[in-house]
Amino acid sequence: DKNKIVAGAIVIVYDHHKRELNSNLMHVQHDYHELILSTQHVHVAHDLCLETIAVKGKAQSLQSLAHKIIGTKGIKHGKLVITDIE
């Protein structure tokens, strides 16, 4: 059910040296702030960052958010994992 409330995480890996990527990610996250519970940023290599974004909301909304984030130019890998909380 697309309107079911779920929780999960969006995990992305990206090169933090990519021009304008951090700014673009920040704008998307601010646009969807009501769905984002927290963000963890880890430097996993000299050029690579891993970001875990904890999310909660309607399944369809989380899929839309994940699609925008993972589709941002410069994202190397990304995945949305959700679980039922009802």
Residue ranges and their predicted role:
Residues 1-86:
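Long, contiguous binding/interaction regions
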